[in-house]
Amino acid sequence: MRPAQASIDLEALRHNYRLAKRLGGSKALAVVKADAYGHGAVRCAQALEPEADGFAVACIEEALELRQAGIRAPILLLEGFFEHDELRLIAEHDLWTVAATPQQVRALAEFQSPRPLRVWLKLDSGMHRLGLSPEDFRAAWLRLRGLPQIASLVLMTHLARADELDCSRTDEQAVAFALTAGGMRAETSLRNSPGLLGWPALRNDWSRPGLMLYGANPFPQDTENTAQLRPVMTLRSRIISVRELPAGEPVGYGARFVAERPTRVGVVAMGYADGYPQFAPNGTPVLVDGQVCPLAGRVSMDMLTVDLTDHPQADIGTPVQLWGDAPQVGALAAQCNVSAYQLLCGLKRVPRVYMGEAAAKEGVTR
């Protein structure tokens, strides 16, 4: 068996969810869209369901996967629905939906639902992606709030730059949301992961932690709050070949690395097809049996190479850690000029191994 694998620590996932609840002082929907950011949506939801207030996914297909796996907790569709026919499935499977466009609001107003629906009305407070204008938001509130097919409304918006702690845009969005939603008696949802970790003055009834659940820091620097996160995924492999090269010999495609001295090179079963960043620069830290070794040469589809010259004990079969507690995925992403979101969601081929499942089956552990 190829040695590449991702270890998923479900107890760390539960720890991070509890941290989100504690920081938010509110209910929290665990965001498990995109296959739980590459961690496995079903397994993560099963681990969290005993204590989670609910889950959030991007679309109905992701929600139905959870329902079919036996998840009975509330599930919110963050993008709402795309076709009128989906409303029947939303009602049938007891899902919650976002309404972020006038078309979605109109469809909800006209839908004869067999059961009242819980709708999250989304304001565009400055993200300018999904969301209603302030005028349409107020009109939607007035149109939907008294309808028999609407069980309740939650008012929400999405923060665009909360991962920039010195940016005023987050406060501006919070003010815009408060001004527009003022006088509307309903629960609210504002804070995402960076909003929870970096903006303690923000308040809402429902938070939506995503990236932080998986132990990744959304900021370029550590803070008191991010230091409490526990990495959920550890990406591991092993050395599958070792060779000795004289000074002046190149390694890999494009000869991006050239040995400046007699060099011992280790080949690791991990490449960009596995989700490791293709353009990670020379010197990117790779943990070889607990010792940092520098990446040496361009990452290939299935393999990468590291300089083992200063680690003579390393040999074929030696374990390698690509990210986890060290190096952390956020730091690796910054070094490679990508985002932690992209790295985590990009793991398609690597098999996942889950730890901490016994605690999930036996109930909540504190």
UniProtKB/Swiss-Prot annotation:
The active site is at K33, Y253. The gene is alr. It comes from Xanthomonas axonopodis pv. citri (strain 306). It catalyses: L-alanine = D-alanine. Pfam families: Ala_racemase_C, Ala_racemase_N. Gene3D superfamilies: Alanine racemase, Lyase, Ornithine Decarboxylase, Chain A, domain 1. GO terms for biological process: D-alanine biosynthetic process. This is Alanine racemase. The modification N6-(pyridoxal phosphate)lysine is found at K33.
